[in-house]
Structure formats: structure tokens, C-alpha cells
Amino acid sequence: IEEDGNAHLITEGLRGDGAILVNTEGKRFYDEVSTRDKVSAAIIAQPEKSAWLIVDQSMVDKSAVIAGYIKSGYTVTGATYEELAKAMGVDEATFTSTMNTWNQAVEAKSDAEFGRTSFANPLTAAPYYAIKITPAVHHTMGGIVINPKAEVLNEKGEAISGLYAAGEVTGGVHGANRLGGNAVADFVVFGRISGQSAADNAK
């Protein structure tokens, strides 16, 4: 999040790669590898409706994506947990305790606090980095109902002759939670189907 309010999409894949989330109090607050809708709701429930995404140098070394975030100035950094906490503006003792507790959880393969079951790596390789994040709408799943021919259905579930739809204006395609990247297939597949259906109807 930039000072002017503009923001950039940060991949959620970093959480699966070993990153953790802490709130503005320096504490973890949720299972980071839960579904995006649940994690987003948990972030919104935090002070300032935001969180910090924490990674270490070992993650940076393996990820051109993170290196790009650093180059773009999206991160704050510190040579120690205390220095990173200071750069983030959170309590140093609390954040350090959070990091130590997480590293112990990784070693034990057991997260007693939030039940996370994915432990890619401890965050022990200095320097450390944090990215300020907040949930934002970048895709909608609610909308008008279509059938397999991409025909728009009325309230009775009947196809409306000559009316077709595809993409984000439609609902029910992804269920309760969209998986990253699936929207591209949705647009392409139903876009093509709607075009074919419209062409067939025009014959």
C-alpha cells in the first residue's frame, strides 16, 4: 500500500511458500494458508484492516517475485527481528516473540495457535522483509445465472432467447471461493461458448 492510497496485487502464493502474517500489534492472527476469503476476512477484522506479510532472505533467494517487490520499494527490512519491527512500527518484543514462536512451530511441525499444517521453512535467514497488505476486490463471483451454453437464465431457470453472458458478470461458476487463475479459464471457455451459441442462434 503506497502513501497515496494506491496498491499493488501481492501474490498469496508467498504464504504457501512459508511467509506469515502479523497484525499491526506484531502478532499472528490466523492460519495463513487457509482460503483467500477466510484470510481476507481475518485481515479485515484486524486493527487498521491490514497486516504485514513477513519473509526472510532464504525466501527472497528462491523467488524472483519477492525480489521484484523489494526492487519496487514495497518492503521494509531489518537485519534482526527487532530492526524489522521498528521499521514496521510494531512492538519489538511482541514481534520477536511471534517470530520465535513461529519458528518453533515449524520445527515441531505443529501450530498450536492457529492450526496451520503447512510448514515450508522457518523464517531465520536475515535480513527480514515485511510488506504491508490489505484485502481488495479484484474479481467478483456473484452475477447472473447461465447454463452450459452461456445462455442467461430468468428467475424460473429458463433460457432467455438471444441473451448470453460470460466472465465476471456471471455467477455460480466458481462456487464459494475462486481459485487463483481459474478466472482466466472461465473467461476464455465461456467467452468462446457464448460466441458460438450466439452464432448458432443467428443462423
What positions do the PLM features span?
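Residues forming the flavin
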Residues: I1-K203
